[in-house]
């Protein structure tokens, strides 16, 4: 028996020795586990790595062009290398200004860092690998982490280089999609790597030197505690500036009185309010002169125009990361970071597509009806999904943005809401309803407009009847309701006012900044990316530059004395220089990073254009450092 099985055993050993060994590395252990499960058909064998929260999954898989391979799927937990200055440039070892020219070191984390175990695991698993496949998130940051993984693996095994490293392109964890990604890998995009390297080094250099400069000033005057850090960030300060600017506008607001003319006509027992074409005026006497002219003499108001025309309320665009954060903040009073964290968990669980995307147009090849079908069993929106498949489906609108990396956010598979945590439940329901709304028809209605002329003044009444709700049936976040139906008026008809009076009002102050408004401003001004905006907002709160406060039904940002003084001080110091507080420099940086990603410019091109501007601002600030401490003292007294 032993002799008869010997040739078979030798054949198996020979096959194993000739099989290629492929090391796959994901950005998170949850992704590694799911991808391994899919590619192995559920037969992956887990074993411990050198970091307790990451497992290694062994299985066999047939890659196109390689035949059957022995595969190990593992993961990292974000970046595996650190970029910093050398020890001679540590805090207290040199003046902050020297960091403008200090070289960078990219190195492994210290042994006490949790990443050390992850890095050692990559080194160990890479030693016997013939190929490396990167399964990090498919964005700029993920590409850079992929390059870090390759660099570490190459140090342990020179065979693993750009030629033998693949990059899996995927946006969700549906099995068919993951298999397609495994069978159609690409090369690492070193242009994206260069863009992240540029942004990392630039932000680290400028952020570190200004942070040390500010902290030294505040501590020298004992304005902050010994362990406190007054940090500067190229995105952080423009974000703070938006909040402070709004706060100042609210505090400095002085209401102004205005006057308007309200006219009402009653016909067939129905009162119809007409709006004055001038809206309101700030000259009380002039309004009363017009009012007196209207009332004198026998001339009656006359209907000069009646029209009824179809109108539409457009369905929403496909969902981007920024829109997800704004909507969750507005509709659910959820912090933007909490919304994004919940979306990340839904993605890693396979419920939605990758939630970090700037794209607001679905690719033509995406099987939209297939994903609608997966929602038909829902008790909450299944009826609407079924209706779409029975003939009500309409192609989604297309926006103007395509990041070329990921489609908009959409539901990949059905989920039972009862099994999800509260934040995840809200986000998942919103993603599904938004997707189904995108695949529905616009809401439709009839708008009636009646124009009335009375002497020299024009008044207008509007009516709206919603005739087809369509996407509104599944998307309760959009409000479009019928107004009172207007009675029939005829052009040329004279009417008798049932009331006409002068109404006095006052201008209203702007509201304090909400998170949804702040995110919209940051997005419009190029501050941060879809993936980082929430972090920048959270950071100004963590640094005690702003506080969150409930006013009425809204949670708003109120700047602290520290936050206000920082903005006021830099405004005063750099009054004739380029501002560190406005979005111009950061917007320019984001534009440059996109150009690096396309291969149009290099990192050095960006450094040579932008760094001198920050250097000039630093030199000016360094000479007038007393303004920073003086402003803080004055602001604190003013708010106390």
Curated annotation (Swiss-Prot):
The active site is at residue 354. One of its GO terms (cellular component) is nucleus. Residues 21-175 form the Toprim domain. GO terms for molecular function: DNA binding; DNA topoisomerase type I (single strand cut, ATP-independent) activity; metal ion binding. Its EC number is 5.6.2.1. Gene3D superfamilies: 3.40.50.140, Topoisomerase I, domain 2, Topoisomerase I, domain 3, Topoisomerase I, domain 4. Its cofactor is Mg(2+). Introduces a single-strand break via transesterification at a target site in duplex DNA. Releases the supercoiling and torsional tension of DNA introduced during the DNA replication and transcription by transiently cleaving and rejoining one strand of the DNA duplex. The scissile phosphodiester is attacked by the catalytic tyrosine of the enzyme, resulting in the formation of a DNA-(5'-phosphotyrosyl)-enzyme intermediate and the expulsion of a 3'-OH DNA strand. Belongs to the type IA topoisomerase family. PANTHER family: DNA TOPOISOMERASE 3-ALPHA (PTHR11390:SF21), PROKARYOTIC DNA TOPOISOMERASE (PTHR11390). This is DNA topoisomerase 3. It comes from Candidozyma auris (Yeast). The lineage of its organism: Eukaryota, Fungi, Dikarya, Ascomycota, Saccharomycotina.
């Amino acid at each position: 028996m032993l002799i008869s099985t010997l040739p078979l055993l030798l054949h198996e050993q020979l096959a194993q020795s000739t099989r290629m060994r492929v090391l796959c590395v994901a950005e998170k252990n949850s992704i590694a586990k799911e991808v391994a499960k899919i590619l192995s058909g559920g037969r992956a064998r887990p074993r411990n790595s050198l970091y307790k929260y990451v497992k290694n999954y062994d299985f066999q898989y047939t890659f196109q062009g390689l035949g059957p391979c022995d595969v190990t799927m593992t993961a990292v937990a974000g970046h595996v290398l650190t970029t910093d200055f050398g020890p001679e440039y540590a805090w207290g070892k040199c003046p902050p200004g020297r960091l403008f020219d200090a070289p960078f070191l990219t190195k492994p984390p210290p042994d006490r860092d949790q990443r050390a175990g992850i890095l050692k695991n990559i080194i160990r698993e890479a030693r016997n690998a013939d190929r490396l496949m990167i399964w990090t998130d498919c964005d700029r940051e993920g590409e850079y982490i992929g390059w870090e993984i390759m660099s570490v693996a190459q140090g342990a095994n020179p065979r693993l280089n750009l030629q033998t490293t693949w990059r899996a392109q995927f946006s969700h964890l549906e099995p068919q999609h993951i298999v397609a990604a495994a069978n159609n890998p690409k090369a690492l995009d070193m242009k994206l790597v260069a863009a992240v390297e540029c942004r990392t080094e630039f932000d680290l250099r400028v952020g570190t030197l200004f942070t040390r400069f500010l902290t030294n000033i505040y501590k020298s005057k004992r304005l902050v505690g010994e362990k406190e850090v007054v940090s500067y960030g190229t995105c952080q300060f423009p974000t703070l500036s938006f909040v402070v600017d709004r706060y100042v506008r609210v505090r400095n607001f002085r209401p102004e009185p205005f006057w308007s003319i309200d006219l009402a006509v009653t016909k067939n027992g129905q009162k119809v309010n007409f709006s004055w074409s001038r809206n309101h005026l700030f000259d009380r006497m002039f309004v009363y002169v017009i009012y007196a002219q209207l009332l004198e003499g026998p001339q009656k108001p006359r209907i000069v125009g009646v029209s009824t025309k179809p109108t539409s309320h457009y369905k929403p665009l496909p969902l981007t990361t920024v829109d997800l954060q704004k909507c969750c903040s507005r509709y659910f009073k959820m912090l933007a970071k909490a919304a994004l964290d919940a979306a990340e968990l839904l993605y890693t669980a396979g419920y939605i597509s990758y939630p970090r995307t700037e794209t607001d147009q679905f690719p033509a090849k995406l099987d939209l009806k297939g994903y609608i079908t997966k929602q038909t069993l829902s008790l909450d929106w299944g009826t609407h999904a079924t209706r779409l498949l029975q003939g009500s489906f309409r192609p989604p609108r297309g926006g103007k943005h395509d990041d070329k990396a990921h489609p908009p956010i959409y539901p990949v598979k059905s989920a039972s809401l009862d099994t999800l945590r509260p934040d995840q439940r809200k986000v998942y329901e919103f993603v599904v309803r938004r997707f189904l709304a995108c695949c529905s028809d616009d809401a439709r209605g009839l708008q009636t407009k009646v124009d009335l002329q009375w002497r020299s003044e024009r008044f207008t009444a509007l009516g709206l009847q919603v005739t087809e709700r369509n996407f509104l049936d599944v998307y309760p976040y959009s409000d479009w309701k019928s107004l009172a139906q207007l009675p029939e008026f005829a052009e040329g008809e004279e009417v008798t006012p049932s009331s006409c009076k002068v109404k006095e009002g006052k201008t209203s102050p702007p509201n304090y900044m909400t998170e949804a408004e702040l995110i919209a401003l940051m997005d419009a001004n190029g501050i941060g990316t879809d993936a980082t905006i929430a972090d920048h907002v959270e950071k100004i709160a963590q640094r005690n530059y702003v506080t969150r406060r409930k006013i009425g039904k809204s949670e708003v940002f109120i700047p602290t004395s520290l936050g206000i003084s920082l903005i006021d001080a830099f405004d005063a110091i750099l009054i004739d220089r380029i501002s560190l507080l406005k979005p111009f420099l950061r917007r320019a940086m984001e534009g440059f990073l996109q150009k690096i990603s396309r291969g149009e410019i290099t990192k050095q091109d960006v450094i040579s254009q932008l760094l001198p501007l920050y250097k000039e601002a630093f030199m000016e600030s360094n000479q007038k450092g007393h303004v920073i401490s003086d402003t803080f003292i004055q602001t604190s007294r003013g708010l106390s």
